[in-house]
């Protein structure tokens, strides 16, 4: 705010490697911090210790990474500044640095890039999502993050492709970080490409991914995030139930799974399950009882209303049967009722003890190989025969 030394009326912020950006409510941009490559966009390479107003106007989003920044206007144009030796600014050349904001070019280099609705920056590459739901990328590609099937670095935008070599379409949102690229489609499928040394591509391996490849998940994905590190990278996604899955580098506990050790297999750190009012049900033989399970969200980030479609299964129908949520004791002993919701991939169980009806057991005699066991009507057990193993 003028004269106070404080910024106000800010609607969005962004952090690069060592640089900060703030967008005001009217679309102006202030930036400050490390500026060796001109990533602040004020016409010089002097590091700024206080916010400086830039020439940008009508800005709705800024994405910044280690040494470059990309700004998106309300009308879908893209401005870039900073490091460009790998072509990440998409201006048709590899000029080492750009100190003033200038417009990104279209893939054919015949005009400025237009009709963009989201931008994302990795360490040395940039992704853009257009209004027609297609994705383009430019910049460093040695680890295949441009998803064009090559390792050729580009200085102009190029369409990103899926594993069938088709240009990816129907895209809802994009994310870039380090040497990785991620997209989520309108039907909540997650695709990834790029460097995969710690399994950060969610593919259950550590092989680099050359084209956007679908990630196998049980239900739809809502959001994706990854650390900005190009090497020791950790990634996470949130599914439609709000459950969080993490993968990748874990040298300092980044995965949140209570372990120290990296993993290329996604792990849920959300304790989502089906729980019953009573985890242990005691019933008598010949009687019934009801169980009333509920969905326990555990640690989640999205509080969506969940429609549960439960299925019940007795693991030993000689002891107890189940119909809907009603358990019937048919034998004597202990079993479990498995509760599942295959739509949302959540599960639970209830332990069931079936006791003697009215204290009167049904007499029964059973035989082993060399010994016998008898259950008397008073509920006592008698044994006889070979006892070499304490049977």
Residue ranges and their predicted role:
Residues 46, 57-59, 96, 108-110, ...:
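Short coil/turn segments at the loop-to-beta-strand junctions that recur within blades
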Residues 4-8, 62, 110-114, 165-169:
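Short glycine-/Asp-/Thr-/Trp-enriched loop segments that recur within the blades
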Residues 19-22, 31, 68-71, 80, ...:
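Conserved core positions of repeat-based scaffolds
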Residues 1-3, 30-50, 79-104, 136-158, ...:
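Short glycine/serine- and acidic-residue-enriched loop/turn motifs that recur at repeat junctions
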Residues 271-362:
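Extracytoplasmic soluble-region selector
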Residues 192, 236, 243-247, 260, ...:
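An edge-strand/N-cap motif at the start of beta-rich repeat modules
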Residues 11-14, 24-30, 37, 57-63, ...:
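Tandem repeat domain/solenoid detector
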């Amino acid at each position: 705010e003028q004269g106070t030394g404080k910024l106000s009326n800010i609607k969005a912020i962004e952090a690069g490697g060592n640089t900060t950006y703030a967008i005001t409510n009217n679309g102006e941009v202030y930036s400050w911090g490390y500026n060796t490559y001109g990533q602040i966009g004020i016409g010089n390479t002097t590091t700024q210790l206080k916010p400086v107003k830039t020439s940008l106007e009508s800005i709705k989003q800024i994405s910044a990474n280690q040494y470059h920044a990309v700004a998106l206007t309300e009308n879908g144009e893209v401005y870039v500044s900073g490091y460009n030796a790998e072509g990440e600014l998409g201006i048709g050349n590899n000029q080492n640095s750009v100190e003033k904001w200038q417009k990104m070019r279209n893939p054919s280099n015949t005009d400025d890039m237009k009709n963009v609705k989201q931008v994302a920056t990795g360490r040395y590459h940039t992704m853009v999502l257009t209004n027609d739901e297609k994705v383009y990328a430019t910049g460093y590609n040695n680890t295949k993050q441009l998803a064009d099937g090559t390792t050729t670095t580009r200085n102009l935008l190029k369409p990103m492709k899926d594993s069938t070599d088709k240009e990816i379409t129907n895209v809802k949102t994009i994310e870039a970080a380090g040497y990785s690229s991620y997209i989520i489609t309108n039907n909540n499928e997650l695709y990834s490409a790029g460097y995969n040394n710690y399994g950060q591509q969610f593919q259950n391996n550590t092989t680099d991914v050359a084209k956007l490849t679908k990630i196998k998940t049980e239900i739809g994905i809502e959001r994706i995030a990854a650390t900005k590190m190009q090497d020791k990278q950790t990634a996470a996604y949130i599914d439609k139930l709000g459950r969080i899955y993490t993968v990748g580098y874990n040298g300092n506990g980044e995965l949140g799974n209570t372990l120290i050790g990296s993993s290329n297999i996604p792990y849920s750190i959300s304790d989502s399950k089906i729980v019953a009012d009573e985890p242990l049900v005691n019933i008598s033989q010949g009687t019934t009882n009801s169980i009333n399970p509920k969905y326990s969200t555990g640690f989640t980030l999205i509080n969506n209303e969940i429609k549960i479609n439960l299925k019940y299964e007795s693991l030993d129908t000689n002891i107890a049967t189940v119909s809907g949520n009603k358990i019937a004791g048919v034998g004597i002993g202990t079993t479990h009722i498995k509760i599942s919701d295959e739509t949302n991939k959540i599960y639970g169980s209830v332990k069931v003890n079936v006791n003697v009806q009215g204290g009167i057991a049904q007499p029964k005699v059973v035989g082993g190989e060399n010994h016998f066991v008898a259950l008397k009507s008073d509920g006592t057990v008698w044994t006889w025969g070979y006892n070499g193993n304490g049977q």
